[in-house]
């Protein structure tokens, strides 16, 4: 079932048990068509199609349906009703979003307009505890239309910081904005408070009154959210406003060695490429051959035009040749081996211009694990 809950997924039937496993394609809530943590948009139409296919192939022979993360449904009649309403939920969201999109509504407008019909919405397994009608509708719009809603005012907006400063000025200054926002808060208009005070927080992140009011508004939105992921985002945002970005030991978690071993060399080199600091690489050209002494595989890396390309085999005229076992590369990537120790022990050797090799690796940035979300 490619393109549904995951890029690669499958439903499978156990005939000896009259049992059908639906992986994550049929669950006891409305699932995400776009996970809020960030990913490519999933295909609601394909999701409904594969549910329909599973019903046709297996529902008539199944006495039990179960999923990866949720509890089973017993009984042929009950499981058929469950699967059909899950199917129709995704199909309704898809078809009605496209219908309204073709009438000229934007993703935000559709999300405020579209609701599931009562016969689907009343089933607790169709409720938005994880995905939501609102952000799934926006995801369907995004899948077909992208980020731009065709309004040229949205084509090249100012950054949140620059726009925030101008919004605050237009609203009569920070004190006037806060006075109006507190009045709106008192009326329970928390969505509007969060939207307005966000401008002041980005214009003046040291404004304690703005941070406190914004945190209170986000907290109230979190308490009111049926959706667990929305609640978590709201409450985490409130925590950042009150306490700053709170770091934890999770930042020190290493990549699992078995995961690193499963990566192809091309995937590792692609990961290097997206970590290359392009501006710092300006004007630099470096070519490195890389030999895996245990597998006999050869590759090359070429830095030019501020881009790191790679390919199989060696190239003539390389600045340096790096030789090491693939297992050593895996250990270095996983953080289980010290580069200096690997060179000292002879596991890793370099022929040619070692300084250029060092320069190449110095241009590869490390990820910033902790960063601001609701503050600039």
Regions found by a protein language model. Give the residues of each.
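A generic alpha-helix preference that emphasizes hydrophobic side chains
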Residues: 9, 44, 107, 224, ...
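Well-ordered alpha-helical segments embedded in enzymatic catalytic cores
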Residues: 46-50, 180, 196, 328-331
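Feature captures hydrophobic
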Residues: 189-195, 202, 206, 216-376
């Amino acid at each position: 079932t490619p393109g549904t809950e995951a890029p690669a997924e499958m439903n499978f039937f156990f005939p000896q048990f009259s049992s059908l496993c639906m992986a994550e394609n049929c669950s006891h809530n409305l699932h995400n068509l776009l996970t809020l943590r960030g990913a490519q948009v999933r295909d609601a139409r394909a999701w409904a199609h594969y549910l329909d296919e599973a019903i046709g192939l297996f529902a008539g022979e199944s006495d039990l349906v179960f999923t990866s993360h949720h509890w089973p449904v017993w009984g042929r009649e009950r499981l058929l009703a469950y699967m059909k309403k899950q199917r129709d939920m995704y199909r309704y969201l898809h078809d009605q979003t496209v219908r309204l999109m073709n009438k000229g509504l934007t993703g935000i407008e559709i999300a405020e307009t579209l609701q599931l019909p009562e016969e689907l919405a009343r089933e607790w397994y169709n409720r938005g505890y994880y995905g939501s009608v609102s952000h799934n509708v926006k995801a369907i719009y995004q899948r077909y239309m992208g980020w731009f809603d065709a309004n040229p005012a949205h084509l090249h907006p100012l950054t949140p910081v620059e726009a925030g400063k101008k919004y605050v000025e237009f609203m009569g200054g920070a004190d006037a904005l806060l006075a109006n926002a507190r009045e709106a808060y008192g009326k329970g208009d928390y969505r509007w408070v969060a939207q307005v005070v966000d401008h002041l927080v980005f214009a003046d992140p040291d404004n304690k009154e703005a941070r406190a009011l914004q945190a209170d508004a986000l907290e109230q939105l979190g308490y009111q959210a049926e959706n667990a992921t929305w609640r978590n985002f709201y409450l985490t945002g409130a925590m950042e406003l009150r306490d700053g970005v709170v770091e934890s030991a999770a930042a020190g978690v290493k990549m699992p060695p078995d995961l690193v071993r499963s990566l192809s060399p091309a995937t590792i080199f692609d990961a290097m490429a997206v970590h290359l600091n392009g501006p710092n690489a300006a004007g630099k050209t470096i070519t490195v051959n890389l030999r895996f002494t245990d597998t006999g595989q050869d590759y090359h890396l070429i830095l030019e035009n501020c881009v790191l390309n790679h390919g199989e085999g060696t190239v003539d005229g390389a600045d340096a040749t790096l030789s090491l076992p693939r297992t050593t590369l895996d250990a270095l990537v996983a953080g289980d081996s010290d580069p200096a120790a690997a060179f000292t022990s002879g596991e890793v050797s370099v022929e040619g211009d070692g300084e250029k090799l060092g320069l190449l690796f110095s241009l590869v940035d490390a990820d910033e694990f902790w960063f601001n979300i609701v503050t600039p």
